Swiss-Prot record:
Record bears the keyword Transferase: yes
Organism: Pseudomonas syringae pv. tomato (strain ATCC BAA-871 / DC3000)
Record comment: activity regulation: Inhibited by fructose 1,6-bisphosphate (FBP).
Gene Ontology cellular component terms for the protein in this record: cytosol
Name of the protein this chain belongs to: Glycerol kinase
């Protein structure tokens, strides 16, 4: 425990894919100050995405300084730092100099596809699923680490000698903030590397051998809520969680059956499954989240590819609306979608269908269909896809969905939130505080140092602004959802497979 009596603030560092942010919270979990700084995206080849790790550190440091200045605060008034980060993005740097040997390879980058194909040919797909909880994909850090060691001359030998260090963005920032004293990650970030056994909670030797990654470069793995070290100005760094897991904790989803949906371009759904690591039969990821004290708890994760992007399509390509905010007004002008379903499978279907050959379609068109019906069907598609994922999670886990906590831009749309409650038959809870990812990191740091005493105290801080209760008869709900399932079935396997062309 740290003396927090005269230190009344926690700073959360939210290191994202396109920007670094710093958010300062007071003891009542109110936002006191925020600062944000974007950084350059590098695309050296088609499908490749990189960041400059030094720029990430510089922007994150600048945001911290700016947030403090805006609130007229000094370092010695900050009780702790919590860090949340874009997951999977991979950095390797020199132990002595702290200089990266290559740019950070970002989670979206597909350059290590061939490495993953080879693992598939070697029959490792099931082992990876069973051990790491993940699907075999270039998304995760393991194949990115191998790619750097394969392509930077002499790096593997240097790694074996202990001259190099690997980390996801949390690890990199902590190394820099502590002046090279601490090489650590947390369980949530480790669980996204494809190198970590989520059952034994240790780095997996077989995966390290298969990818030829020397153990010497790996960070120590710790819980998401403890003091890892101190910044150069003496502030304890006391919380770490990957962005989606931080949002799950910030939403207080710490008991089995509690779930959150982040409505962004796509949707990220996580459901807490407690002490049970559930293997999904529907292509969900099994990942590590946080229990009530920041300890290990398991979660299922599923993604919807097209959420907010469907509304962007209505605005930018079809020109049916001028602003995404207009959708609520138009959807509310009609009593239903008039039998119209929009399946936004623009890039195929994600969980639980996993059909890259599906394509988008509008169904149920008649002469009576107006623009308002199509706009309404677009919003409804986001809620239907969310139900697809949550139904699969409930089947996988045997846990009944208690409620759905929501965050992200689209939660301001009252029509969408009400329809979400109706189609799930579960109440949807919208928090007053929209900064749930940063809040999760702040909560984890604050609990570690006694800034907040317990989860019960935090529950009082996590104020729910509005609860949307289902207002739809079960028979009608299931009829609507059956129509959606029929529409989805018609979009499946639309594109010819490559070998058929």
């Amino acid at each position: 425990m740290t003396d927090t009596q005269n230190k009344n603030y926690i700073i959360a560092l939210d290191q994202g894919t396109t920007s670094s942010r710093a958010i300062i919270f007071d003891r009542d979990a109110n936002v006191v100050s925020t600062a944000q700084s974007e950084f350059v995206q590098h695309y050296p080849q088609a499908g490749w995405v990189e960041h400059d790790p030094m720029e990430i550190f510089a922007t994150q440091t600048a945001c911290m300084t700016k947030a403090l200045a805006q609130a007229d605060l000094h370092h010695d008034q900050i009780a702790a730092i919590g860090i949340t980060n874009q997951r999977e993005t991979t950095v390797i740097w020199e132990r002595d100099t702290g200089r990266p040997i290559y740019n950070a390879i970002v989670w979206q980058c597909r350059r290590s596809t061939e490495i993953c194909q080879q693992l598939k040919r070697d029959g490792l797909e099931e082992y990876i699923k069973d051990t790491t909880g993940l699907v075999l994909d270039p998304y995760f850090s393991g194949s990115k680490v191998k790619w750097i060691l394969d392509h930077v001359e002499g790096s593997r030998e240097r790694a074996r000698k202990g001259e190099l260090m690997f980390g996801t963005i949390d690890t990199w920032l902590i190394w820099k903030f502590t002046g090279g004293k601490v090489h650590v990650t947390d369980y949530t970030n480790a669980s996204r590397t494809m190198l970590f056994n989520i059952h034994t909670l240790e780095w997996d030797q077989r995966m390290l051998d298969v990818l030829d990654i020397p153990r010497e470069i790996l960070p120590e793995v710790k819980s998401s809520s403890e003091v890892y070290g101190h910044s150069k100005s003496g502030i304890p760094i006391a919380g770490i969680a990957g962005d989606q897991q931080a949002a799950l904790f910030g939403q207080m989803c710490v008991e089995p059956g509690q779930a959150k949906n982040t409505y962004g371009t796509g949707c990220f759904l996580l459901m807490n499954t407690g002490k049970k690591a559930v293997k999904s039969a529907h292509g969900m990821l099994t990942t590590i989240g946080c229990g009530p004290r920041g300890e290990v708890a398991y979660a299922l994760e599923g993604a919807v590819f097209n959420g907010g992007s469907t509304v962007q399509w209505l605005r930018d390509e079809l020109k049916l609306i001028n602003d995404a905010l207009d959708t609520e007004y138009f959807a509310g002008k009609v009593k239903d979608s008039n039998g119209v379903y929009l399946v936004p499978a623009f890039t195929g279907l994600g969980a639980p269908y996993w059909d890259p050959y599906a394509r988008g379609a509008l169904f149920g068109l008649t002469r009576g269909v107006k623009v308002d019906h199509i706009i309404r069907a677009a919003l409804e598609s986001i809620a239907y896809q969310t139900r697809d994922v949550l139904d699969a999670m409930q089947q996988d886990s045997g846990e009944r969905l208690k409620s759905l906590r929501v965050d992200g831009g689209a939660v301001a749309n009252n029509f969408l939130m009400q329809f979400q409650a109706d189609i799930l038959g579960t109440h949807v809870e919208r928090p007053q505080m929209r900064e749930t990812t940063a809040l999760g990191a702040a909560f984890l740091a604050g609990l570690a140092i006694g800034f907040w005493s317990s989860l019960d105290e935090l529950r009082n801080k996590a104020v729910i602004e509005r609860v949307f209760e289902p207002a739809c008869e079960e028979a009608h709900r299931e009829k609507l959802y059956a129509g959606w399932q029929k529409a989805v079935a018609r979009t499946r396997d639309w594109e010819p497979h490559e070998n058929e062309e």
